[in-house]
Amino acid sequence: DQVTSDLAGAAGRIALERAGLQPDDLDRIIVATDTPDYLSPATAAVTQAKLGASHAGVFDLNTACAGWVTALDVAAKTIVTEPEERFVLVIGAYGMSRFLDWGDKKTVTLFADGAGAVVVGAGSQPGWLATVTAAAGEYHDALGIYTGGTYRPATTANLAQYGPPHVQFVRKFPATFNTERWPPLIERLLAKASAAAGTPLRLDDV
């Protein structure tokens, strides 16, 4: 019966313990999830309360499967640009079992529940070198949970017509989607990281 904030809190406590920190040492908590406890308030606020991290500012971030790495990027840039913020707790939490149609083999074999967390802070050695981001918004209607938001509220009529909120594949992605989209991103990232590191980086260095 664990909800997303329970998973996030458990991962956050482990990360704090391994970092040798207390909840009140945190300046910010970012929870990356597309399965929040509620539409509002933020799951990060619920997690803050469960951790007892009363000093930390909080927000959720939703970029679906890319959520955790996006949150990590935001945290790293926060540490660089906000010197008074020393520690940011980044949590990726997934409670997708609540949104599965157990008769749909396309989704039940892909999605599950879990959480992971890290504490991001300044260090004496170079850490986060570079980020590149991209999105294919034209496929927003291909895979997702389409009931429960403002587009299709969870009204009695919509639930009767579409059923409860479930993750679903609506249409296929092109077979060449990954092979066409990823290599240019990797090349851009290596170029950007090379500039930040002051030395050329190649795939063999990764």
List where the protein language model places each region.
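Condensing-enzyme catalytic core mediating Claisen C-C bond formation in acyl metabolism
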Residues: 1-2, 104-180, 184-191
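Phosphate/pyrophosphate-binding loops at sites that engage ATP/ADP/AMP, CoA/4′-phosphopantetheine
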Residues: 11-27, 185-205
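Buried hydrophobic positions in well-ordered alpha/beta secondary-structure cores of metabolic enzymes
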Residues: 15, 26-29, 47, 71, ...
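Acidic-glycine-rich active-site phosphate/pyrophosphate-binding loop
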Residues: 38-52, 90-96, 150, 154-160
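Beta-strand segments within the central parallel beta-sheet cores of soluble alpha/beta enzyme folds
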Residues: 24-32, 59-62, 85-93, 129-132, ...
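Conserved catalytic cysteine-centered active-site region
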Residues: 2-6, 33-87
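Short, well-ordered, mixed-charge alpha-helical segments that flank or form enzyme active sites
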Residues: 38-40, 67-69, 96-100, 137-140
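Flexible, glycine-rich active-site loops centered on histidine and acidic residues
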Residues: 78-115
